[in-house]
Amino acid sequence: MSLQENVIRPTANFPPSVWGDQFLTYDEREDQAGLEKVVEDLKDKVRQEILGTLDVPSQHTDLLRLIDSIQRLGIAYHFEEEIDRTLHHFYDAYGDNWTGGATSVWFRIMRQHGFFVSSDVFKSYKDKNGAFKEPLENDIVGFLELYEATYLRVPGEVILDDALVFTKGRLGEISNDPLWRNSIVSTQIIEALEQPVQKRLHRHEALRYITFYQQQASCNESLLKLAKLGFNLLQSLHKKELSQVYKWWKGFDVPTNLPYARNRMVECYFWSLSVFFEPKYSESRMFLAKVFAVETILDDTYDAFGTYEELEIFTAAVHRSSVTCLDALPKNYKLIYRIILSLYEDMEKILTKMGKAHHLNYIRNAMMEYIGCYLKEAKWANDEYTPTMEEHKEVTTVSSGYKFSLIASFAAMGDAITDETFKWALTMPPLAKACCVLCRVMDDIVTHKEEQERKHVASGIQCYMKEFDVTEQHVYDVFNAKVEDAWVEMNEESLKCKDVKRPVIMRVINLARAMDVLYKNKDHYTHVGPELINHIKSLVVDPIMA
């Protein structure tokens, strides 16, 4: 088969990569071994601080704040067992009736770790008339903590719905008050209103919080030093990984061979880093970065290059998943097929080493479902058919690639993943569905106008406008509400999924968090500008200065 001649293709003319080949090489730090010894000593010291006051109720509020700082400084992965032990101790001792201070922090942390504590603790925040009490001038931080706690609410928690509206309004007023305008608290408020803690990427939050934490009188110097050294050491690992995946990508010379496709390997690694940053997930992180790169090529091939007839043949070849299919494909599709096979080979090596080679079948099945839905979209575009919202949702929550991304993210996670994990994810349970809906809707909001400039399947925005005869702005309002509803539903499902291990749940939540960076307000992934460039540089280029 050869590419069809005289075909008018809906090429999108995407912007080129902004990075060049700067990540092709990696220089390892000479002082790394010495720093690792310092980190281990600091970890021992902090570990003793966590466990030293566990049996002293009068110090539980301080212990809670220590755990909060550890989490927000990005070093909780060093102390998973100690934190888990502490929070179980809190739950056994207090249940829903926390008697210490910092109630909002307690509520947020407990729910973040899967403890379904009651929101009734906030009834005391209301006056006798049922209205929320105004923040005291000397406790603006406590008011901000209540705001952050509301983002862990579940459907039907009216008290937290009301608290969000109340705190959001008051915090906006406080941030503009001349008395607070240039203060650290004002900066915290502005950042929280832009993106609450529950939606932040762990590594970005670590950078933010280190800057804030070192200015506090209560700053724990051991904790701060561990956070800074740990960030830089982990950044060295991330740089090395990025170099490895970039070399893999460079070998296919995508800009030359597939000039219609977005060249976004660096952004793909950042995306994967957003899903998991911890050292133990190194192989998972590199594999998922490659998955995102493959998904980008497939997206651009199905949306902005291929004819329906070509895509039918290519889809059938992917379903067969055999090197013997190469001869039947034209040049462009041959390369894409080789990249997919390379992806499978990488995963098979990793899984075989783990004794879980059969898990590759789940990834292949997810890929076939994903690419099959792409073909359905291509047929809609070819037939100039505008689907109903229900039809659109059923197909595009899969063709968007987020379900496949979730399943691929599990692949190299080791003992945390079983056959049941993959079976659970493949059925699109409520937690995964809410995440995929959130991702699809956020994507639609910021990409649909540019997509419709070429021949493209109707977006969710267009489908909704046609079916319900409403304005574009009305659909934006509806879709933005869907995003917030999805977050609330994910909160609930993450608390209810008792048979699903916490690391699995966190992959789902972190994928949603990544969307709040890549697709918030604009398509930062396609049109890489200063904001995303700075995000990426801060994580894989610029170390923290001691």
From Swiss-Prot:
Mg(2+) 2 binds at D299, D303. PANTHER family: OS04G0344100 PROTEIN-RELATED, TERPENOID CYCLASES_PROTEIN PRENYLTRANSFERASE ALPHA-ALPHA TOROID-RELATED. Keywords: Lyase, Magnesium, Manganese, Metal-binding. Sesquiterpene synthase involved in the biosynthesis of alpha-isocomene as the major product and detectable amounts of beta-caryophyllene, beta-isocomene, silphinene and modeph-2-ene. Produces exclusively the (-)-(E)-beta caryophyllene enantiomer. Mg(2+) 3 binds at D443, E451. It comes from the Eukaryota. Belongs to the terpene synthase family. Tpsa subfamily. GO terms for biological process: diterpenoid biosynthetic process. It catalyses: (2E,6E)-farnesyl diphosphate = (-)-alpha-isocomene + diphosphate. Highly expressed in roots, lower levels in stems and leaves and detected in disk florets, but not in ray florets. Pathway: Secondary metabolite biosynthesis; terpenoid biosynthesis. The keyword Transmembrane does not apply. Mg(2+) 1 binds at D299, D303. One of its GO terms (molecular function) is magnesium ion binding. This is Alpha-isocomene synthase. It holds the Pfam family Terpene_synth_C. The Asp-Asp-Xaa-Xaa-Asp/Glu (DDXXD/E) motif is important for the catalytic activity, presumably through binding to Mg(2+). Its EC number is 4.2.3.136. Binds 3 Mg(2+) or Mn(2+) ions per subunit. The keyword Lyase applies. A motif (DDXXD motif) lies at residues 299-303. Its cofactor is Mg(2+); Mn(2+). It is an enzyme of class 4 (lyase).
